Swiss-Prot record:
Note: Present with 300 molecules/cell in log phase SD medium.
Disrupted-gene phenotype: Deletion, when combined with a conditional mutation in clathrin heavy chain or deletion of GGA genes, accentuates growth defects and increases disruption of clathrin-dependent alpha-factor maturation and transport of carboxypeptidase Y to the vacuole. Causes mislocalization of AP-1, especially in cells at high density (postdiauxic shift), but doesn't affect GGA protein distribution. Sensitive to diltiazem-HCl and hypersensitive to chlorpromazine.
Role: Involved in localization of clathrin adapter protein complex-1 (AP-1) and subsequent AP-1-mediated clathrin-coated vesicle cargo loading. In complex with LAA2, cooperates with the small GTPase ARF1 and the phosphatidyl-inositol-4-phosphate (PI4P) synthesis to confer temporal specificity to AP-1 recruitment.
Protein name: AP-1 accessory protein LAA1
InterPro entries cross-referenced by the UniProt entry: ARM-type_fold, Laa1/Sip1/HEATR5, Laa1/Sip1/HEATR5-like_HEAT
Organism listed in the record: Saccharomyces cerevisiae (strain ATCC 204508 / S288c) (Baker's yeast)
Keywords from the UniProt entry: Cytoplasmic vesicle, Golgi apparatus, Protein transport, Transport
A GO-annotated cellular component: cytosol
């Protein structure tokens, strides 16, 4: 279709929308993917462009264009048109202007139907006729296209086409005027596009200061006035987008020089008034859509005034914002102000990258703090002022990523008034710094809270990296403690929260701070003077908060017990005291107890709880007699604190039924007392409300145990709490009074700005209330979801309500938009104890609790939802009737009715979801009552209520249906669905239809297994085509709900849906575009295009790989939908489109979508979100570019989701599409957003998928780690600089940064810091560097698996150590640990590598100093015990790795020696370097780390045979061994002491002699005990006396048995954990391999259990484990033999030995199943057995174990064992794998043959004879030569004598031939030597040698090879020597034999061997001269004698020895 004429396509089309969009999509894909444009491609682009022009001409003259009203298609067409111009403009420079001029003519309704060169007379005739046609200035598709494209052309080429502006202005205003004249001309989209064109011209012309001439301004001003007047009088509605663009257009006017000149004297006041009072002021911020455009416009105007024109200072700019903010009446303006502020900050940051440097952001914050003016503080509620603080918090969240660490640190120091290097000593600076400093004055407390909030953010972000100086840390700590104990309560509680974060970053000061506060409390409690409550409250609150979450490494158990004793002893004596000082002290003690309930130790809680329950019973169950209001109030406050303590306890313990019963009793009594109180006052009411709320919160903890038996009176109370229509009807009311039926009381509220306004009755109206209570609406309701409270322990259903639209949080400004609809502020000071009892937040969205009335409503609803599902049906029915009375009461206000309806529906909805999750049933009558109640609720146009009602209908039908059988269930569902289908058909009201269609969808959703999909589908499908926007959008949403639960969809339905989705997407009668204002506005919030995208996405998931089976037209429709949504400039659509692509990519369907396009779009979203701002382009700029500084509204959420997509593409191995282009961008994201899990995952996958083929990964990471931010952002800043220049914003003083095309910033040859001079030299923030460090560690650990990568990394050892040093020097635990892990990696992997320049030395020897330097910072002040423990481990690795002798590693070895000294005084602290350890737990952690380190060094010194290291460690064995033994004993005592849950600490001083929970100690021993066992095993094996010095024999045996048991227990507990088993099994081997007898192991029960464990390990483990098991089983066999040394004892428990041998046999049989006695296998079966090299090694080891053990067994036992083993060997000889396996069993075979032949028992010989008989056929005919020779040699050389003469002859031939074969010659030669040595031991061998020698003679005569003959000669000589040595009588014969062979030898090889023969003869003569003479003279033949003589004569001559006689004389031994 791409090559077809577009005009012809449309002329012949039956579906214009589909065919036009398909043509556009096809060509868009083509143009976007063009890389280098050659001539042919240029012509193709030109052709596309021409066809587009032709198409526009064609439709401009069409009469009927109704089916071409396709604005969404025209957006895609505009993209194609603009891209084609970009591709052509270099080749055809005039194409930009010509195209714009042509489109201008179309818009101006000029005749464009015929080109000048067209000669067609018919066309000329048409032209003539049309030239007289009157211009209508109304909408037409051609003009819509022209206008749309012109907007984009001006955004891209504005300066090139500015001459067309007058024509366009004229056309724009004439068209707008005409359109607005009559409703029939009205076209919402076209008039918006016209105004967008006007604004695009204003923004992008090259003469912006004069562009808005007076005449044009007058037209525009008039238009604006007309529009706003019409809105004001409700005369006419306009598209909100149109109004937004109208407001944008005003920006150009305010930026013009004339305007500025005219208002130069009052420019600030003018801007202020225009944005608060005039047209913009009234309408700009009020609407959710226009607000963001108004915010952008204000920011751009002020940016122009400040940055471009310098007419305002920055301080004046902020003052304008403050003034607007303070003088507004609604939250809309407040949010808009901060949205504008952030946009302005980022515009300035782009223009000046130093805009936020140093403390400039703090200046901004303090300038904006003017919103806390004295008037505001005095006249606004706490609710409002708290919201002001949240605006600042949101601003910090957005801006903080762009601040570097030094700027953050500087601002923190300024706020806290630190006397650091940042502070100057000059007077001017001191005065300046004073303005930053924080104080605690009542009149400035809100400013102080603002500073505290910022401090919290900074400290949380900086972690511990800023705490480098001890003085500074103490200064900050003291300042925070001062603030935390000041007079102002709000400041106190906020400061404590900061102090907690600060001290968790500097935990070494935790204990000291708590001690100081406890000391202060103790002093004041004892003092008789005035008790200063605020100061002591601060100290108590500090202690309580610091205990929560603190590590026991820093807070000792002893300190916890002191605090416990302090608080409980006071309460015990003053439980209910209300006298002044005792009351206050009691409250503080309860606060301490609340904090103590958070101490992380279950055993501690168990110890304290009896006493606490006593307190609670005394306080809560007894009726208190009071005399006045003050006494009652104080008692209620004490009760409240006691209840909070109970709540905190329940949050930290395991609740059981008995405990729930106890607590429930307490609560009932407490509640009864509250209801008995008649005294009425504001204070008492408030205290009672807090009490009731706390009671409900405690009930929430018990809900699991009380839900089926809930207190009915309490149930009535909680229902009234959230549904009583008589509550909250006015500004405020006394809830407690109403609960007691005592009437309502009103309280005025200055923030209630809307009390006199007639408001729409909807949730939206409630959410926009300013009165702080929103008519009793729950804070759980947010408008689009129902949130759960964090304190509820019940089921959490965090799924959005059915029918919810995608979240708006893709837009960065959504955090401010949420504030617009958040009427109730969470405030810490209203319930400061939440810091202690809370789990980190009040709810899923709020950190703190709201006011107590709202919190009571929330708790009541949460408790109701948890209890209602489990009540019986009668109670449920009764409750629903009560709720109906409340919901439909006429005696209340409309807004209160809405609030009640929302609360009830939300509570019911959560209850029904719990029923759904737990598969609970609901009685039919109850269910029907609820359904009818829901239907009766009015407020039909309220979206939230409609959605939740519809979802409840679905949940209700499911709950009722569960009571029915399958058949009845289907019938019931059919009935219900038909009711709603009938309602849809009968009712025309759109909102009612919306409710019914959503109800239909939810019925299917929750009953999909039983409902008929087609029935629901058909109805909803028909409704989708309803043109009413409400019905259309919600029907689509209902279809989406339907499809999400229909998991299998047929292709026909999928095709129908996709075709329909395309149709609904492109046609202007549906969706966001078109004539109707109502439809356009409604679709701003409920965009049907978004729903279409969701449906399409769901189809990609459901249809999956079957997508490929759809026909071409449907696939075209799908492609059209995805690409249209991708380029729609709507982030939701773009993300949905990209997720559709993600699904397609996951299924690897590459032919459906163009991957490159979607990845470009993904990258564009990521890039546009680096800087936060509001987009200024009306079109997606991914493929066209833009001249705007911020063209697209940034979306960090969208960016992170696109990182997730790219991560997935790595997993799918599609990185070639994006990896190179994303490299620089991803590094920048890592620099800015290190907290993002998506970014971290991206880098992890990137490395994991590329590190094998990219050897430069370490270089990249190392480079980025050391890179400055300036260098990192250099090319990005260069691009921004170019944009600034285009927009005329680049100041003359700026110098352009020169650079080449952007290349990888991680290039090894990157710029140095000096190269990047003038740029920001600040390093990446510490979090980014921590991630890089972690990535380096990951790279190292992954490289360990690949030898080549490990070798490649060896070239980077110096850099690895350097990066380790960089990490270990940062004051952050994570970075220190990672640095040490990298160092450990280097030591473990490279210590054995030799230095190529000094081969004898380790490659690490030269790095010794650097290694030490990287290690020692771990012992600097502030290092955690965890860091120091691991550093000690690394120090041990340095020593053990043998990079240098210990004496040359002075600092390291001395460190370990010094650490041993700490064991001398158990009561003192430990000092390591600058670090001091004081708490017992931390101290023990270090001590165990020291012992663990020494254990490692000792083991390695023994196993590595390192003499120097052994000598070094040996000196300390006498110290270490007792310490290891003691530690292991301690471990076992802690672990197995069942008498109590606590252990007495043996060596503590009396002062510290307090019981310490077992759990706090046992965790210390778990990681190290195994290493102690291994070390003791090694030392035991090396020198048993060292251990015997500490333990006697009996103790040692018992101790070793305990160690053995521990190892077995660890194995059993971790039977499925390979890593644990690989640690434990070597330790077990070390324990067993000692030479000691451990008798206990072989007791019946124990050995049985041991065998069972071994069996399981063999059956489930891998080969590595089995290798170790062979050693262990062998150890046990040896141990059995030692423990049963006598024959009697040996045989007594022989079955145990059998079991151990069976285990070995099991290992063999698993690999050789054919050896099993009862298994019959054929050779074919054998072939199926796969034996790996690992199996071969394991078999070899197992057979060796057999061989090494059998000799030690009793003879009686051996027979059975021999039989078994011979059977196995025989099976092996017969199997098909014999050639591989036989070499393994030969040593065992040899041992067996030797043992059997040497046995005196004839049975053994027979046994061997039978064996030989069974395998001799295999030996002689089937074995290969090597195994054959080896087998024969084993039989012969070990004395097997049952061979026949024929077999002996055959053996002689085989072995003789083996000598001739190079492959078998070594084996044969060695075998012959052994045979010769045994010829007199085994007589048969003499005969055998006779045969062999005979064969030798034959071989010589047949010209054997010289080398073989030489070997045989030597064997004959050896034979003769052995004969002479053993039997002298045969000496002459044996010498004669040799001489005969020499003669034959000489005859065969003549002169070649004369010297060799002569040497042999001389050697024979030496053996026995007389026998030699006798042989010469009388035995050998004359011929042989002659030969010998001639050889010797020749030898004598050659050696010049004289005569032969002389030669023999010389050589003789005489």
């Amino acid at each position: 279709m791409a090559n077809r004429s577009l005009k012809k396509v449309i002329e012949t089309s039956s579906n214009n929308g589909h065919d036009l969009l398909t043509w556009i999509t096809t060509n868009l894909e083509k143009l976007i993917c063009l890389k280098e444009v050659n001539d042919n491609e240029i012509q193709e682009v030109k052709e596309i462009h021409t066809q587009l022009d032709e198409f526009v001409r064609y439709i401009s003259v069409l009469e009927n264009t109704d089916d071409l009203e396709l604005h969404s298609v025209f957006i895609s067409l505009s993209q194609l048109y603009t891209i084609s111009i970009w591709r052509l403009k270099d080749e055809y420079p005039g194409v930009v202007f010509d195209s714009a001029a042509f489109l201008t003519n179309v818009l101006c309704e000029e005749d464009v139907s015929i080109d000048d060169g067209d000669t067609d007379p018919n066309q000329k005739k048409k032209k003539k006729k049309s030239s007289t046609k009157k211009k209508k200035y109304i909408y037409s598709p051609a003009k819509d296209i022209a206008c749309t494209i012109l907007v984009q052309l001006f955004e891209n080429f504005g300066s090139s086409i500015s001459s067309l502006i007058p024509l366009l202005f004229n056309a724009i205003f004439k068209n707008l005027k005409k359109i607005m004249e009559k409703s029939k001309y009205y076209h919402a989209t076209f008039m918006t596009t016209l105004l967008q064109l006007f604004n695009a011209i204003l923004r992008n012309s090259n003469n912006d200061d004069k562009i808005l001439d007076p005449a044009t301004y007058a037209k525009f001003s008039k238009l604006s006035k007309t529009v706003f007047d019409s809105i004001s009088t409700d005369e006419k509605d306009f598209s909100v987008t149109f109004v937004s663009v109208l407001i944008e257009c005003w920006t150009a006017h305010f930026k013009q020089t004339n305007f500025i000149r005219e208002h130069s004297h009052d420019i600030i006041e003018t801007i202020y008034s225009r944005f608060t009072e005039g047209e913009i002021g009234v309408y700009g911020f009020a609407n959710d859509e226009t607000r963001i455009f108004t915010a952008k416009s204000l920011a751009e105007i002020l940016f122009d005034y400040y940055f471009s024109k310098n007419i305002l200072t920055l301080q004046e700019v902020w003052s304008i914002y403050v003034k607007i903010f303070l003088n507004c009446d609604t939250r809309d303006v407040e949010s808009g102000c901060f949205e504008s502020i952030i946009h302005l900050i980022n515009l300035n940051l782009l223009a000046d990258n130093t805009f936020l440097s140093n403390s400039k952001y703090l200046d901004i914050v303090l300038s904006l703090s003017g919103v806390f003016s004295s008037y505001e503080v005095n006249n606004r509620s706490m609710n409002t002022l708290s919201r002001y603080l949240r605006y600042f918090q949101h601003m910090h969240e957005v801006i903080l990523p762009h601040l570097n660490d030094s700027a953050k640190t500087q601002m923190l120091y300024y706020i806290l008034g630190c006397s650091d290097t940042y502070q100057s000593s000059s007077k001017s600076d001191s005065a300046s710094n004073f303005k930053y400093s924080i104080d605690a004055k009542p009149e400035t407390q809100w400013l102080t809270l603002l500073q505290l909030d910022f401090t919290y953010v900074l400290i949380s972000d900086l972690g511990s990296t800023f705490t480098t100086e001890e003085n500074t840390v103490k200064e900050i700590r003291d300042k925070l403690v001062d603030l935390a104990t000041c007079e102002i309560f709000t400041i106190r509680v906020h400061t404590v929260e900061i102090l907690k974060v600060f001290l968790n970053n500097c935990p070494e000061y935790l204990s000291e701070t708590i001690e100081n506060s406890l000391r202060a409390l103790s002093t004041d409690f004892k003092s008789t003077g005035k008790f200063i409550f605020h100061k002591n409250h601060g100290h108590a609150f500090i202690i309580a908060n610091l205990i929560k979450g603190a590590e026991s490494d820093y807070i000792s158990y002893e300190l916890i017990m002191r605090i416990t004793v302090f608080s409980t002893s006071f309460i015990k004596n003053n439980t209910t005291s209300t006298s002044s000082n005792l009351y206050f002290k009691g409250l503080l003690c309860w606060i301490l107890l609340i904090g103590l309930m958070n101490y992380k130790d279950e055993q501690y809680l168990k110890l304290q709880i009896p006493q606490l329950f006593l307190f609670w019973k005394v306080l809560l169950t007894h009726t208190y007699t009071y005399h006045d209001e003050d006494e009652l109030y104080k008692n209620l406050e004490i009760r409240n604190h006691a209840l909070t303590c109970l709540l905190t306890y329940l949050s930290n313990t395991t609740i059981d039924k008995e405990m729930a019963k106890q607590v429930s009793y307490l609560l009932t009594k407490c509640s009864n007392f509250n209801h008995s109180i008649d005294l009425k006052s504001k204070n008492i009411d408030n205290a009672l409300l807090h009490n009731e709320n706390r009671i409900l919160q405690v009930y929430l903890k018990l809900e699991k145990y009380i839900n089926s038996d809930f207190n009915s009176s309490l149930l009535i109370l909680i229902v009234k709490n959230f549904s009583d229509p008589n509550l909250y009807t006015e500004s405020s009311s006394s809830v407690l009074g109403s609960l007691k039926d005592i009437g309502n009381r009103k309280v005025s509220n200055k923030d209630d700005m809307e009390s006199n306004i007639v408001l729409e009755s909807s949730i939206n109206t409630l959410l926009r209330q300013n009165n702080g209570f929103a008519f009793g609406l729950s804070s759980k309701i947010t408008g689009d979801r129902i949130v759960n409270l964090s304190m509820s322990s019940a089921y959490k259903y965090d799924e959005s309500i059915s029918g919810s639209w995608p979240s708006k949080d893709y837009n960065w400004y959504n955090i401010f938009e949420v504030e617009v609809s958040k009427p109730i502020s969470p405030i810490l000071s209203l319930d400061s104890l939440i810091l202690l009892y809370g789990s980190g937040s009040y709810s899923q969205i709020d950190r703190y609790a709201p006011q107590v009335t709202t919190s009571l409503i929330d708790s009541s609803m949460e408790l109701f939802s948890s209890v209602f599902p489990f009540l019986n049906s009668k109670i449920q029915y009764s409750i629903m009737e009560t709720l109906n009375l409340s919901m439909f009461s006429k005696m209340t206000t409309p807004l209160r009715s809405v609030a009640v309806a929302a609360n009830v529906c939300s509570a019911l909805h959560n209850a029904l979801r719990i029923m759904q999750e737990n598969n609970l049933e609901l009685d039919y009558s109850v269910g029907q009552l609820i359904i009818e109640s829901i239907k009766k609720i009015q407020f039909f146009n309220d979206i939230f209520l409609t959605k939740i009602k519809a979802d409840c209908v679905g949940l209700l039908t499911a709950a009722i249906a569960r009571t029915l059988g399958d058949e009845e269930r289907q019938k019931f569902l059919t009935e219900q669905s038909r009711i709603f289908i009938k309602n849809v058909a009968d009712m025309d009201e759109p909102y009612l239809r919306m409710f019914h269609v959503l109800s239909l969808a939810t019925i299917f959703k929750y009953n999909s297994q039983y409902a008929n999909f087609e029935e629901y589908f058909d109805v909803i499908f028909a409704l989708m085509r309803d043109p009413h926007p409400v019905v259309h959008s919600w029907s689509l949403k209902a279809m989406h709900i339907l499809l999400e639960k229909h998991l299998v969809i047929d292709l026909k339905t999928a095709a129908l849906l996709l075709s329909s989705m395309e149709e609904l997407l492109v046609q202007d009668k549906y969706g966001i575009y078109g004539r109707s204002t109502l439809r356009c506005n409604y679709n701003r919030d409920f965009n049907s295009h978004v729903a279409i995208g969701e449906i399409s996405r769901t189809l990609t998931e459901t249809v999956g790989p079957n997508f490929l089976e759809l026909n071409t037209k449907v696939l075209d429709s799908f492609r059209n939908i995805t690409l249209s949504m991708l380029i729609s400039n709507n982030i939701l659509n773009s993300i949905t489109s990209i997720k559709m692509f993600e699904n397609i990519a996951t299924f690897k369907m590459k032919n459906i979508l163009n991957y490159e396009i979607f990845i470009l779009a993904s990258k564009s979203i990521i890039k546009s979100s680096i800087v936060t701002g509001i987009g200024s382009s009306y079109f997606d700029t991914t493929f066209t570019g833009s001249n705007e500084l911020i063209s697209r509204t940034s979306s960090l959420k969208g960016a992170f989701e696109n990182f997730d997509l790219l991560t997935l593409l790595y997993k799918l191995q599609m990185e070639e599409f994006f990896m190179k282009e994303m490299e620089n961008l991803s590094w920048r994201y890592l620099a800015l957003f290190p907290n993002s899990g998506s970014v971290k995952n991206y880098f992890t996958e990137w490395i994991l998928h590329t590190f094998k083929r990219d050897n430069h990964w370490f270089d990249k990471l190392y480079s980025i780690f050391n890179m400055s931010l300036g260098r990192l952002f250099q090319s990005y800043n260069r691009d921004v600089s170019a944009l600034l220049e285009v927009n005329g914003l680049k100041k003359s003083s700026e110098k352009e940064i020169k650079g080449e095309e952007e290349e990888s910033i991680a290039n090894v040859n990157q710029l140095t810091d000096t190269d990047a001079g003038g740029l920001d030299s600040e390093n990446l923030q510490w979090k980014s560097r921590q991630i890089i460090l972690n990535l380096i560690l990951m790279l190292c650990l992954e490289s360990e698996k690949y030898e080549n990568l490990l070798l490649a990394l060896s070239n980077k050892i110096a850099d690895l150590i350097k990066i380790s040093f960089r990490g270990s020097t940062v004051r952050n635990e994570g970075m220190k640990l990672t640095g040490l892990h990298i160092l450990n990696f280097v030591l473990k992997n490279y210590s054995t590598m030799r230095d190529p320049q000094v081969p004898g030395s380790s490659i690490l020897e030269q790095q010794e100093a650097q290694i030490t330097s990287a290690l020692m910072p771990a012992f600097s002040k502030g290092s955690s015990p965890t860091v120091m423990s691991f550093a000690i481990t690394v120090a041990a690795e340095v020593l053990a790795s043998n990079i240098m002798p210990p004496d040359k590693l002075g600092r390291i070895s001395q460190l370990l020696i010094d650490l041993l000294g700490n064991f001398k005084d158990p009561n003192s602290g430990i000092r390591i370097g600058e670090a001091i350890i004081v708490t017992p737990k931390a101290k023990r952690k270090i001590e165990l780390a020291v012992l663990d380190a020494w254990a490692e060094v000792v083991q390695r010194s023994i196993t590595s045979s390192n003499d120097a290291l052994f000598s070094f460690t040996r000196k300390y064995w006498s110290i270490l061994v007792p310490l290891w033994i003691i530690s292991l004993r301690e471990y076992m005592m802690i672990k197995y002491n069942d008498n109590d849950s606590t252990v007495q600490v043996k060596n503590d001083s009396k002062e510290n002699s307090l019981i310490e929970p077992r759990s706090t100690k046992i965790e210390l021993y778990e990681p190290v005990w195994l290493n102690f066992v291994e070390a003791l095993g090694c030392t035991l094996d090396s020198d048993v006396q060292v251990i015997l010095a500490s333990l006697n024999d009996e103790e040692l045996e018992y101790f070793l048995f305990i160690l053995f048991s521990q190892c077995l227990e660890a194995i059993v507990k971790n039977i499925d954990d390979h890593s644990v088993k690989m640690q434990v099994l070597p330790a077990l081997h070390n324990v067993l391999k000692s030479n000691l007898c451990i008798k206990s192991i072989f007791e019946d029960d124990i050995i049985t259990e041991v065998v069972e464990i071994m069996d399981r390990l063999i059956s489930t483990g891998d080969s590595k484990e089995e290798f170790l098991l062979v050693d262990i089983i062998s150890d046990l066999i040896i141990g059995y033999s030692k423990c049963n040394a006598t024959p009697e004892t040996f045989l007594q428990d022989i079955d145990k030995l059998y079991e151990l041998l069976r285990l070995l046999m099991t290992i063999i049989s698993e690999r050789l199943p054919f050896i099993k006695y009862n298994v019959l296998t054929s050779e074919e079966d054998d072939n199926e057995i796969k034996i790996s090299p690992t199996d071969i090694s394991l078999l070899k080891k197992t057979f060796i174990a057999f061989e090494s053990n059998i000799s030690n067994f009793d003879n009686m036992f051996k027979v059975d064992l021999y039989s078994c083993l011979l059977f196995i060997i025989g099976k092996i000889y017969e199997c098909s794998h014999r050639e591989v396996i036989i070499p393994i069993i030969l040593p065992l075979f040899k041992a067996l043959v030797k043992a059997l032949t040497e046995s005196e028992d004839e049975k053994n010989i027979v046994l061997l004879e039978i064996f030989y008989g069974s395998i001799k056929d295999v030996i002689y005919h089937k074995l290969d030569s090597k195994n054959k020779v080896a087998t024969i040699l084993i039989l012969l050389s070990n004395g097997y004598s049952k061979l026949s003469f024929q077999e002996l002859n055959q053996c002689a031939n085989i072995l003789s031939e083996a000598l001739n074969n190079p492959a078998t010659q070594p084996i044969a030669l060695q075998g012959f030597k052994r045979i010769i040595s045994n010829i007199f031991k085994y007589p048969l061998l003499q005969y055998f040698m006779k045969l062999v020698i005979k064969r030798f003679f034959q071989d010589i005569q047949t010209n054997d090879s010289l080398s073989q003959a030489s070997i045989k000669t030597k064997l004959i000589i050896q034979f003769s020597e052995e004969v002479i040595k053993q039997d002298h009588q045969k000496a002459s014969l044996s010498i004669a034999l040799c001489l005969s062979f020499f003669a034959a030898y000489h005859s065969a090889y003549t002169e070649k061997i004369d010297n060799e023969v002569a040497s042999g003869i001389v050697a024979l003569a030496k053996l026995d001269k007389n026998s030699f003479k006798e042989a010469i003279s009388s035995t050998i033949s004359p011929q042989q004698k002659a030969i010998i003589g001639s050889v010797m004569e020749a030898y004598v001559k050659s050696q010049s020895l004289g005569s032969v006689e002389e030669a023999f004389q010389l050589k003789s031994f005489d």
